[in-house]
């Protein structure tokens, strides 16, 4: 029987630090071995690079995005597969699922790496050390946030009193029990407020800064439906002057840019050419180079539901992220099974490499739409519409293509307008299922896809037990203090 992941992290060389120490391709997140003493500022900086490397580990980044994309309604799986994406897509979860087992392990490994640095730095020793401590506090909270989204029910269900995940704020060799969702959220907020006060260096979007902490705070408060606070922290990012929305034409190539060269990106996980994971890259299921046909599987496509939404406005710049595949001779739409091949390219073509990208975690557009959603819920309708239209104008829309308070174009409510715009702006960026369920909305697939028994219709209610994942079986076997999800 394998020991519990959290328990054994104290006994092993830090996974992420050792990887980045021995492989140049993990730069700029390079680090020292965990066995090296953390004595000097240089040691702590190296260990901090190791903490960043933790969120870059393949089973962290890949599973983070796939587990956040496949349960939604923007993707269409085109056939049966033995890959764990089948379970993610069809909601056929089970305790020994590879995706959850691997992500749980790597997320707590990343938390452990951050905790090592946090424990070594006293507040106020120096601005440089305060900065490092703040960065590690953010990294610790980012992993807690992703974990509680996967394994704890939406905060809005039960006011956060449902069971969440174990909070891990130290490197002790223990067997923690699960905290409530509210306890996890409160912990993250306290951490992030401290982190934002400690970080005084405006690092680029490969690294944490106080604005990155504010971005996560805005999202957390939005999930909690503490709308005034969500607006407050969105404003702090927007008004910082550090970021700007890309213009319409450059925006069409947004995801091919290095994050540090992109004025809109707040935080991203930086990959370089040596990192190219080919058929194990995030985008390998969503794209295959139409010229070589040898860069990915390309078996999961943009859903017809999403395409119908985009097609309402043919001049929407966001069409650029979808590539319809046609027969070169007849021009007919290509299909796999009953699913039209709409490739999605948000994880492709950085540095001219088909499967290379630096996945974006936070960008400025989200701050505008966080603010819009919060204002919609507060009844500040004009403010909500104004922010939605900022995003639509950037997408190249104008005139009657914009909303007014008196013309919602059949959407029914300001909130529906905002949520639809979030779908258009962030498709395949890992937000859609959470946006639905935290707003007590069902996930409805009314399009062709390998959904399970019905290949044209599939619905999941927000209260369905399968909205969240099982705690990994090996963790349950080793830790008697854990309680399994129903």
Spans of model-derived segments:
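Bacterial Sec-dependent N-terminal signal peptides
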Residues: 1-32, 486
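Short, surface-exposed recognition loops and adjoining beta-strand edges that mediate ligand/DNA contacts
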Residues: 33-35, 62-79, 153-161, 201, ...
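Conserved, well-structured interaction surfaces
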Residues: 83-150, 179, 194-200, 352-359, ...
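Extended ligand-binding clefts on enzyme/binding-domain cores
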Residues: 224-225, 231-352, 357-363, 414-433, ...
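Membrane-proximal, proline-rich intrinsically disordered regions
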Residues: 22-68, 297, 311-314, 399, ...
